[in-house]
Amino acid sequence: MAVYGRILRSPRIAILVVATTLARLPFGINGLAILLFVREQTGSFAVAGLTVGALALGSAIGAPLAARLVDRRGTAMLMPLALVHAASLLAIWGLGLAGVPSIVLVGLALIGGAAFPPSGSVLRSRWPQLLGDPELVRGAYALDSSLIEISFVAGPLITAAAVAFAGPEIALGLAAVLVIAGTALFLAKLPASPAEDRHEAHRGLLGALGHRAIRTIALTTMPVGFCIGTIEVAIPAFSDAQGSAELSGVLLALWSGASGVGGLIFGIRRVRHGLVQTYLAIAVLFPLACLPLAAASAPAAMAALVMLSGLPIAPLIASRNELVAAVAPRGTQTEAFTWLVTSLVAGLAAGNAVAGAVIERDGWPAAVMVGVGAAAIGAALALSRRQTLMPSPVPAG
């Protein structure tokens, strides 16, 4: 683990890591907080679900555009985005209490999702510049993927604590404060990017997706998200079948924790293969690690199997990020990383929806198998398009 100490002792790095963690905690807070708040104010789970769906839709549509704006105009654009995002959360709070029509809350959530500042993507695009040493850069991508897992676990816990203390509106207010404070701290400590990167930004309609490697990685990321989404729903269904609804929280925490541990271990490995080979190997390993979940018959067995299936998740994300850093054209790196987040989240949403329908008809093991099948198709697609993943011999840009 010495590599992580070296990373965090590098100039500015520890503060930048803290800042991005604070800035993206709202990503884990907002969904549950908005769901609970809108449900409380309107009395309708349907309206609450529609509002959360609008938040996700706004993120899916707006995040790549926001990232392209940052690539072309510079990181100073992060703060206006953070302010719009925070304002939308506070408006949902204030107008929700005032009893405005539900469509207003849905619209505000759509705006808030679209304006979420991509500080994490910016930092991922800067690791090579900030650290230089390839060993430290590899470790930084692994550390980042593990911290993402922590954010997804901590966000709902923060919301739950806020609800227990006062109400879901407090979680919305906290999320607004965190996104502004984290973004401000991030911008204060982030060195300026090379000016030529913005001059070389692709002006085409597709932006980062104009590069074939980015298209392949985005395309093969979606089935991974789909598999994760099906398992997210299958685990609570398994717990319900065992007669212990609270078991799902423990299992999901073990799953995320194992992913974080896997990411940290991945970051200190010795490099024996190239970026493409590493990414493809973990892409193949992931569905194989998830497959045994469908055979779990008792809580202890499921606990062991969710940890097994979680181990490759953060390494897969980290290896993917390393590859993107190597192949993304100059001036499009922030957008490239954001497209991958969008692909993952889109896959998650689809996996959640499909798993619910499959569980109703065929049970939770069938949902796991559907997710594993999707991940296997994604791995096969990556293998079949491996030549598109090779860094171009001609300087990109």
Per-segment meaning from a language model:
Residues I61-T75, V163, G262-L275, I359:
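Helix-to-loop junctions at the C-terminal end of transmembrane segments
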Residues G331-D362:
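A late C-terminal transmembrane helix in Major Facilitator Superfamily
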Residues A2-A60, A208-A253:
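Helix-loop boundary and gating motifs at the non-cytosolic
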Residues L110-I148:
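Cytoplasmic helix-loop-helix junction between adjacent transmembrane helices
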Residues V276-A318:
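C-terminal transmembrane helical hairpin of 12-TM major facilitator-type secondary transporters
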Residues A164-V177, A357-A375:
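A membrane-interface helix-boundary motif in multi-pass transporters
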Residues V84-V100, L285-S297:
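C-terminal ends and interior cores of transmembrane alpha-helices
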Residues P117-L131, I235, P315-A328:
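Intracellular juxtamembrane helix-capping segments at the cytosolic ends
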